[in-house]
Amino acid sequence: FSAMSAVLNVFPKEKVIINRERAANAYDTLSYFAAKFLVEMPINVLPSVVFGTIVYWTVGLNPERFGYFLCILMLEALTCVCLGLAVSALAPNAEVAQNLGPLPLIVSLIFGGFFINLGSLPAAAEWLPYISFLKWVFESLVINEFTGVTFTCELADPTACAATGEEVLKRLTFTNTLGESV
C-alpha cells in the first residue's frame, strides 16, 4: 500500500509541465507514463522486497519457494505503483488523488480472500474477487507456500485440522494453480 500512496501526488504536481511539453510535441502521454513508471519502480519495490525478505525468514516459510514469494511481492508492488499512477493521473489535484487512492485498495482488500472466504459470497458479488488484485496476490502466496505440504494434527478430532496443503487451498476455495494466479 505504501507503493501506491507514494505515487498518488505525482501527476497533479506535474500536470502543468506535462501539458506544456505535450503541446510542444516533446513526448506523448504513453512515453511519459512509461518513463515515470520506470523511475518510480525501484523506489517503491525495494521496501517491499526488504520487508518481505525479513518476514519470510523470520516466520520460517519454505526456503525453496522464496524466489516465487519475492516475485509475487514485486508484482504486487508494481501493480500498486501502476494503480497509484492511474488514480493520480485521473485526479484533478493532489487532495482528490489522496482521497480516491484508498478506495480501490479497500475494495481489493475486502474481496481478496483474506477476510472473507470467497466461496461464501452471495451470487451478486461473486465477480468482485476477479477484479481484486489482492485476491490474486493472496492466492498466489498461499498456493506457493501450501502446495505439497503435509501436516500432523494432534487434536482429538483429526477432521478439525487440514492434513495437507491442498486441503487448506480447498477450504479457502483456491482452485487455480500458481501460474494461473500469478
Language-model-derived ranges and their functions:
Residues 1-182:
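Membrane-spanning alpha-helical segments of multipass transporters and channels
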